[in-house]
Amino acid sequence: MAFSIPIPKFFRSKELIGVDIGSQNIRIVKLKHSGNKWTLVNLVKDTIPQESISSISPEERKSVIIDKLKKLISSARVDTKKTCSSISGGSVIIRYVVFPKLSPQELSQTIAYEAEPYIPFSINEVNLGFHIVGDVEEEGQKKMETILVASKKEFLREHIEILRAAGLQPTIIDIDALALSNSLEVNNYLPSDATVLALNIGASLTNLIIVENGILKIARDIFIGGNNFTQAVQQTMGVDFATAEEMKKTYGLITPQEKTIEAKDEKFRVGGALASVYRDLVFEIQRSIDYYLARSPEKSIYKVYLTGGSAVLKNIDANLSNELHLPVEVFNPLSNIEVAPHIQPFVENIESAVQLSVAIGLGLRREGDA
């Protein structure tokens, strides 16, 4: 599954590095392809300190990210500066729409006109991209299901400026949701005869996708992430962010079997704080499932995959399975990818591996992908 927002290209070369700039972490990967096998040959990463970053201006934050990118690129010693990176968040709009049947070339030429009714911004303020899902017929007319992506020009411009200021050459701009889909696909997590739902629970938001028979049907961002869980603990327990983060990891969510714990118990108080955010997340997940099933009443969800930093929050998989009445499994984006020996110590535990799902999806891309 491919998508890109067109940006100027400087050189022609297929190999790219995947650059995942999240709200809390930066990850850069390089993947090599040989035969039917992918190998992770390079990985560098760094964190963006939350408490210090929240007290500085957007321009200062931008400088911090550029500086960290420069240091990571220097330490990685990669043989290309061409990148595939991704965007997400409030300045990125993802819509599932049905357009008149057109070729990709025709849609590229008319996308502004076709997209205008679906975009809550002025069409002149956004860059547009699309991913054609497949053909459908409505009232005897041939049409096509399409995932439409609009990014505010200012937001995209800043993203590109950051990459260039760090000495990189932005070549493909993707979205997190499609990178996640690519990551699932290469690891053989997308059956050709079933529908799966995947959640990438990052620091500030959750990417949700629903993939039917290997075809992406729904992609959206939910503005709930690991930091929301941490902040809920911080507020309830009256501690700083770092302490709240440790409490979150130590105790996790309360299971139905643990509901008898005394209310004054620290585990119960932390679990109660986490539960308030968790309920909001479940509500949004269920909304997406209901929307999908309303459009495809003959279908059902086969399985839910969890990835991202909060995929390993204690009991979140069991609780989600109980709430959604579906099997839930943690997705390891390296399960079908070889890892170079010098990288293995950094990804051998699942807590580290699940944070690479978007980066791996980006690293799979090659210049010239449709």
Question: For the regions a protein language model found, what residue spans apply to each?
Answer:
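Hydrophobic/aromatic-enriched cytosolic interaction surfaces used to assemble or bind macromolecules
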Residues: 1-370
